[in-house]
């Protein structure tokens, strides 16, 4: 048992553009080496690509890749202008992001429990804060593993894939659920 008392929960300030605490935490998950402004550009750029793709799909069923601009820097600058000014695009992007996060969130996971000399993988239900943390972590991890040219496009396509029920993060969630289902017989060992 830990001898210290539990650390107090710190409140997260909402992000400046969407005023969403969920998105602020996601920006922090994308951030590396304390470079928050870079992480914000990546996330906002990805959400802009997501908004354009969803608008094109619902509107004209066009290609709407956002990749036709040539250099990746051009995409970032153009996308930041669009998402900062267009309220509908902002709402659409946020809803799509929340939908992706909901689909990636796992419900159960397995934890090791030692009973009488043997170790069992015991399925346990996950509390909401950990579900969200795992979903954020998996989205960023599997976006990094993609082959697109820039992180903006990798993250955007991972979010879009998650909404449609495919992609690396969704596969990870299914693997975790499959593992829990396979070890359901040991559920009575939970603590």
UniProtKB/Swiss-Prot annotation:
Protein origin, superkingdom: Bacteria
One Pfam family this sequence matches: Ribosomal_S7
Primary gene name: rpsG
Keyword Cell membrane found: no
Known function: One of the primary rRNA binding proteins, it binds directly to 16S rRNA where it nucleates assembly of the head domain of the 30S subunit. Is located at the subunit interface close to the decoding center, probably blocks exit of the E-site tRNA.
Keywords noted in UniProt: Ribonucleoprotein, Ribosomal protein, RNA-binding, rRNA-binding, tRNA-binding
Lineage: Bacteria, Pseudomonadati, Pseudomonadota, Gammaproteobacteria, Legionellales
GO biological process: ribosomal small subunit assembly; translation
Family under the similarity heading: Belongs to the universal ribosomal protein uS7 family.
Full protein name: Small ribosomal subunit protein uS7
Entries under InterPro entries matching the protein: Ribosomal_uS7 (IPR000235), Ribosomal_uS7_bac/org-type (IPR005717), Ribosomal_uS7_CS (IPR020606), Ribosomal_uS7_dom (IPR023798), Ribosomal_uS7_dom_sf (IPR036823)
NCBIfam families assigned: rpsG_bact
Annotated region (Disordered), positions in chain: 56-80
Matches recorded under HAMAP family: Ribosomal_uS7_B
Assembly notes: Part of the 30S ribosomal subunit. Contacts proteins S9 and S11.
GO molecular function (one): structural constituent of ribosome
Entry's Gene Ontology cellular component terms: cytosolic small ribosomal subunit; ribosome
Native source organism of the sequence: Coxiella burnetii (strain RSA 493 / Nine Mile phase I)
């Amino acid at each position: 048992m830990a001898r210290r008392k539990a650390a107090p929960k710190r409140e997260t300030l909402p992000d400046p553009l969407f005023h969403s605490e969920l998105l602020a935490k996601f920006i922090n998950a994308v951030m590396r080496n304390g470079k928050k402004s870079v992480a914000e550009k990546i996330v906002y750029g990805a959400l802009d690509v997501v908004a354009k793709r969803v608008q094109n799909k619902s509107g004209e069923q066009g290609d709407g890749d956002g990749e036709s601009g040539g250099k990746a820097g051009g995409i970032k600058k153009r996308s930041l202008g669009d998402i900062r000014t267009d309220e509908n695009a902002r709402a659409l992007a946020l809803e799509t992001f929340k939908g992706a996060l909901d689909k990636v969130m796992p419900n159960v996971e397995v934890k090791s429990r030692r009973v009488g000399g043997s170790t069992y993988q015991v399925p346990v239900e996950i509390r909401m804060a950990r579900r969200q943390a795992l979903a954020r972590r998996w989205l960023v991890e599997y976006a990094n593993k993609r082959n697109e040219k820039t992180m903006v496009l990798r993250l955007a396509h991972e979010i879009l894939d998650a909404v449609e029920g495919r992609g690396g993060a969704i596969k990870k969630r299914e693997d975790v659920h499959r593992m829990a289902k396979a070890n359901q017989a040991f559920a009575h060992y939970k603590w």
